[in-house]
């Protein structure tokens, strides 16, 4: 443990906790400090000017990151007929209807994303207690309940991330891996922030992008100067 502590101490010394860094500088610092023995994820935390206790100020949605997430995902689709065939053609690993529901009830959850056609929700709705706590419940707000299941599968495979404000009004999301080029991380950063800005609730008043920080799994975090977000 002491070795890890010393490593973190040295890493933290490279960042001024009181300084706001330009986006590119923050990404470069965090990327350079991601020195663990695995490909660390690069994450973003955005504190939004919303009151998450009010339903009309909950920010939720999804965005396809232009450079992907660096993670391969297994997709399950609840659909039948032509939709089921389209989902398979788009690359879904698991496709089914009542049979897939039985698999889920039996505890077979070998997938990362669940997509459903609207007519399948009568089946999927019964699985809420299983899928919900795992963050797998399909929802139209994030594009996982849709008549175009093939497009949803392609988006999931292409690097779509879902976001939702937590109880403190903060969005947490991954924008890539430490192995990504800085330019790719910046593109993903911009895509996510742009999506959040477009999703701003009408009821949100005052400063919307209050604080932004970039960090890695085992490394440091750097605060971002929001004035440089669109620079």
Swiss-Prot record:
Family membership: Belongs to the universal ribosomal protein uL1 family.
InterPro entries: Ribosom_uL1_bac-type (IPR005878), Ribosomal_uL1 (IPR002143), Ribosomal_uL1-like (IPR023674), Ribosomal_uL1/biogenesis (IPR028364), Ribosomal_uL1_3-a/b-sand (IPR016095), Ribosomal_uL1_CS (IPR023673)
GO biological process, one term: translation
GO molecular function: rRNA binding; structural constituent of ribosome; tRNA binding
GO cellular component, one term: cytosolic large ribosomal subunit
Gene assigned in the entry: rplA
UniProt keyword list: Repressor, Ribonucleoprotein, Ribosomal protein, RNA-binding, rRNA-binding, Translation regulation, tRNA-binding
Pfam families: Ribosomal_L1 (PF00687)
Species of provenance: Chromobacterium violaceum (strain ATCC 12472 / DSM 30191 / JCM 1249 / CCUG 213 / NBRC 12614 / NCIMB 9131 / NCTC 9757 / MK)
Subunit record text: Part of the 50S ribosomal subunit.
Keyword tRNA-binding: yes
Name of the molecule in the record: Large ribosomal subunit protein uL1
Protein's job: Binds directly to 23S rRNA. The L1 stalk is quite mobile in the ribosome, and is involved in E site tRNA release. Protein L1 is also a translational repressor protein, it controls the translation of the L11 operon by binding to its mRNA.
